[in-house]
Amino acid sequence: MVRNLDDLDFHLPSHAQDMLEGLQRLRSLPKLADVTLLVGDQELPCHRSLLALNSPYFHAMFAGDFTESFLARVELRDVEPAMVGQLVDFVYTGRLTITQANVEALTRSASRLNFPTVQKVCGRYLQQQLDATNCLGICEFGEQQGLLGVAAKAWAFLRENFEAVAQEDEFLQLARDRLATCLASDLLQVQPEQSRLEALLRWVRHDPQDRAAHLPELLSLVHLDAVPRPCVQQLLATEPLIQESEACQEALSQGHSEELPGLPQKMQEVLVVVGGRALEEDEDGGEEPSHHTGNFAFYNTKARQWMALPDFPDYHKWGFSLAALNSDVYVTGGSRGTKTDTWSTTQAWCFPLKEAIWKPVAPMLKARTNHASTALNGEIYAIGGTALDAVEVERYDPYTDSWAPVGPAPKYVSNFSAAGCQGRLYLVGSSACKYNMLALQCYSPVTDAWSVIASPFLPKYLSSPRCAALNGALYLIGDNTKKVYVYDPGANLWQKVQSQHSLHENGALVPLGDLLYVTGGRWQGMDGDYHVEMEAYDTVRDAWARHGSLPRLWLYHGASTIFLDVSKWTQPFIPTAPQEH
């Protein structure tokens, strides 16, 4: 008699991989491959269905009513045989090796044959390679191959690093129209403005015979009224390109004596701050205040004055993180509510400088509080601050308005800071739960891999560490000490530099020009007065100087730097009333 048994649903986990590996082996047997691709002098046996699954180009070819739909041998033209071979191997293995030597050819072939996955990963590889020597070429290549996100990020890199890019050979090869577009950009971050003029003259000197005729017109794109008068006078007296052209002399003289309408005249790098809960609100017992006060401002370091920006709409928040990318400000995560009723959020906000209004963007994949965020290679990274006992990471692409997960850091830390430096993400922190020692961890976007760096002289412990990158080095401070440390990634070495004048709690460490600004409050005296002074560190002189104070007694805030036209924002920051633009 047969017993009644439950049905058995059998699943072989390795089946899909085994099938692909088997098909890869069977490709060499002509009877078991149903099409052969002819590329140059190479013959590539393969299977129509697999090609069609990976490429809309091949899907249309084999599923449609074309001659190739019925042929056993299909010739492909205008593609490189070696690259097609790599694409076909990818179809069967899901593996691809992208290098600086093959990325352009591979991208062209993937674009020609419409392999979207390969196009995407090649685009990401190019994006992570961006630097001053190649951003112009990558921008043009991205436009040619339809990688518009890559082109946009390369253009943004140019705007943020114009002075460095202008010193490279690629800049000298720019076509006249592309140079004009570059010089005319309102968001070009140059300081001082004469850098724009010097870059233009360098471009013309590279080929004066063909380019000198364009100089008068291109001079109109330079904010000449912002160029120091001695510089203009020197050019008029000594520069042959100017002396040989009456049109150039007139443009230079008039441009410096008259304000050009419609052009931003006072682009300047400034410190921006979004404030959360303030001391007076905390003393009210954590209840929601009956009115809102200003919470978004910038500090004009030249005038030493705080000016109002449109309020961040989520008032009295804490635990959020602030980062700036392409002079747009991003605020992510955080908690709000009373001391007994708080919650983390996935919220993400952006303040696009052109629109000058706060807008919600795609929410994060994970709710985060007391996390870190930083800009790296045209994206925003959010690190840590989730409920899990792991440092979970995700990145935001402003071009697609989407978040994507990144592998977690190998070591768990709860007391940490992060910064992008030389194309990599550095995470410095410790955990009271597992180990007190600070650990230095590094994420490479190119290889999509984390590593733990054993580095000599890394400080043993810092309370609430804060780090920032400046001129290729990583600077580190903490709440519990005035000491300042600097890390050289190339030498893998830490060393001490000049100490701060004061302690700074719950603040930020922000690079601005060639200086580092530190914000944050400190309790002083027996009466417990709360002070919010700022300091600035000169890396050349190895010296700190006190530099004003925060406009409110914020117990929590976020800070970064952006370029904006200070002449367009003229309302002083008055913390006792809401700010409007």
UniProtKB/Swiss-Prot annotation:
The keyword Metal-binding does not apply. Residues 33-100 form the BTB domain. This is Kelch-like protein 30. It holds the Pfam family BTB. The keyword DNA damage does not apply. It comes from Mus musculus. Keywords: Kelch repeat, Repeat. Residues 135-237 form the BACK domain. Kelch repeats lie at residues 280-327, 328-378, 379-423, 425-472, 474-514, 515-564.
